[in-house]
Structure formats: structure tokens, C-alpha cells
């Protein structure tokens, strides 16, 4: 099916939002211009809505295989499509871990069979993510590994991390890291700060993250490796990454929507839906994340979509697993709380969710260019809705944002020229 989207707006190559039509033919973007006509295409009047590149998320947890009670490739990718994401990168903390040919082939077959959006799987750095034996990077790359990470745990052994970075560098691949120094975690369930003190909870100190990042940055410099830092959350981490970039070290970084919108002061009670790792930090950390995003220290936004069951989250803040679901709330949360408040521009938000992650990892995604695969998201910037977890397509309903009123909701998502999801009656 060919589609002609009429009367839309998009961000052009100069970074300006302008009026446009867009023609999709044979799964590709055939033309982006005003006043397009086509005889062999279904016309969809978007009535002034935003035509954006399909969103790109380099940090997601789909749980399959092994955690299908939390999420599946099918439910997770449907949720991604509803959130406007057309390319997502799946972390390897599944069971089994994609750490060898057999496991990666099985995962890729599942993706091919079930996924509603483009899914790029990470390969594990170490066997079973146990930190003691390196995986076969060459084989995992051959089978389509996006990059290498043990996300969910930090690689504690410096010699292992250095060896991994050297091998990844030879393959022109990135090492991606969840950064925690295990000796400083302190069995914490929240940030070590005012909230932990008030509620008598063990806290995770900020330095637990930043000291690990500092170590890895020096290792990346020694290995001449592209090193990407997951979900930055502290002022110290931002400072270390900024200094590394100024020194010419190949480091990039991401931040989550929840760390841009919330800090520990926003946690109303010991609610496990506010429990994520890294935890919500202090006000100064929150301000540093915004500053880092604006000055280029932090390169992109990634959701860290981490679904869990209601039963798991009901165990209380100390025992419940870390993580919140993120696909279906990301854009409206960021648009409402950053763009509408004048903190960043709409153009910047689009870049942080599309071309920045795509360019960082060399993906042919993130831009509406003629000849490229038609991965497109239509967004109604005027539509206001209340976040209602019962409507999520994800199995995970675990969100701290229930009841928040937000503007800027995706209404249609196109993947490879085909409609992957659309809001009923939104485009008529």
C-alpha cells in the first residue's frame, strides 16, 4: 500500500518545522514536499499534525525469552509502536542471555516472527552476564548484535572491561554500560538523600554511578573504543562525561524521560512505581541532567522501558524490582514537561529521540529523507489526555505517571511503509 500524507508539518534539514506533504511508495519515503499529488496512493489528511521520523530508543527491555510474564516481544513492540517508536534496541538481560550463537539465533528468530517494529538486539559482554568470561563478539556481530552490554549489572572487573573494549574497537562496535560500583550500592532501593533518610531506607549514593563511569572512560580512552553510558542520573556523572568529551574521548550518553521530569522530591510515598535504577536523584542532579542535555554532554533520550507485573511491584519498595514502563508515555511526558515549559524546543526533542541516537550508532533512521525506509510517526501536539495505565498495550502497567495530563500523543506509526499502530478515529 502506498500512502500520501497531506497537510502535515515536519522538521526539515535546517531544523525548522515547516508545512509538508509526504509520499510513501513501496515501503520508502518517495517525496517530502508541499502540494504532492499521486494517483496510486491512499490519501491520509493529517490536518496539521506533526509528521516525525519514527522514534529511536536505544535502551529497552522486552523480557523475552524467560520473562514473558512481564512482557513479550509482541506486546513490547506493540507498545513501542503506540508510543511512536519504530526502532528499539533490546537489552540482553533475558533468560537465556544472547551470549552465544544458539541464543542469539533464537532471539533473532523470535524478533522476525513477532516484532511490530524494528528490534536490534544487544549482545552480552560476558557469558550469562556473570562478568567472568567474555562472549564471542565476532559471532554475535555476525548474527546482528547492535552493540555489547551487560546492562542491568555493571562490569566490575576492569581488566574484563578493557579487554571487551579493545575487542569491540577492532569490530568498530560500541560498548554500552550500566554503571554501578557494586561495593557502593549499599543494598539500596532509592537514592541516598532526603527521601531515604526520611523513610529509613538504604540509599544508593550518587558516587556509585559516577566513579564507575570515570573508570570506564579511562578504559575507553586506552582502548580507543566508543563507550556509551546508559541512563545518566547524577551531577558528578555529567561532569565526568563533559570532561571526557572535551578531552576527545569517544564517549556518548543517554538520559531517561523519568530522570528529566522527576527528582526524589517528587516521590509522594514509598511507592514501588517510583523505584527505578538508577534511582530518582536530588534537585541538583536533575538540573545537571537538563544542562547536560542542552550543552551536548548528554546525546540522546532513551526510555529504559522496564515492565514488571503488578504482583512484583506490590512487594513494597525494598523488595519490588527496579524499573518502570516507558514506551507509551515518553513523548507526551517530554513534550508537556520540557517543550511546553520552554526548557527545550520541539525541534530539539525530535532530535534527541530520532537523529541523535541514530547518528550516534550509525543507523539509517531518524530522518525523513527521500529514498529511506518509511519509518514515520504522526503526532497530535494539541491532543491532551490523562495517562491511564489500564490502556497500555505493554503488559507492564508500572508507571509513576498515572493521572498526569499530557499533550503530544502519537496517533499513527508507520514501520517499513506499513501501519504498525494507529489511534482509532484520529485520522479520518
Curated annotation (Swiss-Prot):
Cellular component aspect of the GO annotation: cytoplasm
Binding positions for Zn(2+) 2 per the UniProt entry: 151, 178, 231
Residues that hold Zn(2+) 1 according to the record: 59, 61, 151, 304
CDD domains noted in UniProt: DHOase_IIa
GO function terms (MF aspect): allantoinase activity; dihydroorotase activity; zinc ion binding
Enzyme class, first EC level, given as a word: hydrolase
Entry keyword set: Hydrolase, Metal-binding, Pyrimidine biosynthesis, Zinc
Catalytic residues, chain numbering: 304
Cofactor(s) annotated in UniProt: Zn(2+)
Pathway(s) of this molecule: Pyrimidine metabolism; UMP biosynthesis via de novo pathway; (S)-dihydroorotate from bicarbonate: step 3/3
Highest taxon of the lineage: Bacteria
InterPro entries, sorted: Amidohydro-rel, DHOase, DHOase/Allantoinase_Hydrolase, Dihydroorotase_CS, Metal-dep_hydrolase_composite, Metal_Hydrolase
EC numbers, comma separated: 3.5.2.3
Catalysed reactions, as listed in the record: (S)-dihydroorotate + H2O = N-carbamoyl-L-aspartate + H(+)
Transmembrane segments: none
Similarity section: Belongs to the metallo-dependent hydrolases superfamily. DHOase family. Class I DHOase subfamily.
PANTHER family noted in UniProt: ALLANTOINASE
Function: Catalyzes the reversible cyclization of carbamoyl aspartate to dihydroorotate.
Record's protein name: Dihydroorotase
Species for this entry: Bacillus cereus (strain AH187)
